[in-house]
From Swiss-Prot:
InterPro entries: MATE_fam, MATE_MdtK, MdtK-like. Its main location: membrane. It is found in: Cell membrane. The keyword Transmembrane helix applies. Multidrug efflux pump. Belongs to the multi antimicrobial extrusion (MATE) (TC 2.A.66.1) family. GO terms for cellular component: membrane; plasma membrane. It comes from Bacillus subtilis (strain 168). One of its GO terms (molecular function) is antiporter activity. PANTHER family: FMN_FAD EXPORTER YEEO-RELATED, MULTIDRUG RESISTANCE PROTEIN NORM-RELATED. Keywords: Antiport, Cell membrane, Ion transport, Membrane, Transmembrane, Transmembrane helix, Transport. This is Probable multidrug resistance protein NorM. It comes from the Bacteria. The keyword Plastid does not apply.
Amino acid sequence: MKETQNAREKIKQLLHILIPIFITQAGLSLITFLDTVMSGKVSPADLAGVAIGSSLWTPVYTGLAGILMAVTPIVAQLLGAEKKQKIPFTVLQAVYVAALLSIAVLVIGYAAVDLILGRLNLDIHVHQIAKHFLGFLSLGIFPLFVYTVLRSFIDSLGKTRVTMMITLSSLPINFVLNYVFIFGKFGMPALGGVGAGLASALTYWCICIISFFIIHKNAPFSEYGIFLTMYKFSWKACKNLLKIGLPIGFAVFFETSIFAAVTLLMSHFHTVTIASHQAAMNFASLLYMLPLSVSMALTIVVGFEAGAARFKDARSYSLIGIMMAIGFSLFTAACILLFREQIAGMYTSDPDVLRLTQHFLIYALFFQLSDAVAAPIQGALRGYKDVNYTLAAAFVSYWVIGLPVGYMVGTFTSLGAFGYWIGLIAGLAAGAVGLFFRLAKLQKRYSQKQHI
């Protein structure tokens, strides 16, 4: 990354960082997509088992990965402040934290997974597939968490194309391994959906090893000498990392787990309603990738400028990123409005589900408009290391406003299932307003400091 002089240079640098992040996020989601689709070719039970296992794992992973993503703003600010000598120590401490988190997940997971699956009252065959899928997947938890740290380090230097290429290389690896273990090719036993867990675990080891060699051998990463000096574990550094990482992790967890909670609360509705809701929610999740990518890019560039005490530039980046996300959101809103029948048709051919999905997509339209404001502001605030407010905003907007309002409207009015979407939209909109005022207040404070 480099210092920019005008808005045109800022837009160019932001896009240079943003586009690879977007492709990376899409690539990571495709791994889960491949697991689910290829497992579904074996049997409905395999599809259900993998889908349930993935739905349990995703909130846990995204929340804990959020903790490790604290590396991005920390390293970006060290880079901006020209304190490069502190970066290897910071990255290695994050790897130690990744190892501790891996151990914690393995211990708790092995103790609790049977209990959790038992509470879901699943068919015994589906229960066993989900259990063993998660068991095999757990073999890749440590490399996945270490990769998250290494990816955050690479991204913080503005070299997001590198992580993009690593992620894209993982897709054919995952596809081939799925083919081998799910269907039993090249002398391997046919494990069905369970094999998708093993394939994903081995894929995580591959991308971790690839990242390690890139950091060790290729400039500019090799210039930092990561892993050349094995620093001792530091509780102080760990606490500093967790001080920023825990609020990020919990905020991400609150965001991802709310959708699972809504789906569970909607379980008493007709199958057609649930299927339509899931289709619209899946499409909304796909649209969320862009504001999420803008958010991650803003964390990098705002952190870089804030670390260099160029607060005016940090503010400009924030505004550009927010406007970029809103512009894309308005475009996708128009597409939903005009092509909602075709969008619904990608998910189903059932006429009842098709009709109802189109109605849900109208709510998805307003949902993603709120996301376009909230997500980039969260990223900008994290660039300033202002993470506690984003945690509070995520909790209040989803769990204090969104879910209760959704439950009340969905249960006690004629809107039914649509009420849950109204609740989520109301909560997210309220959170976006709160985040906007927080960012404005923070930037005003830093602007005053710059003029002193």
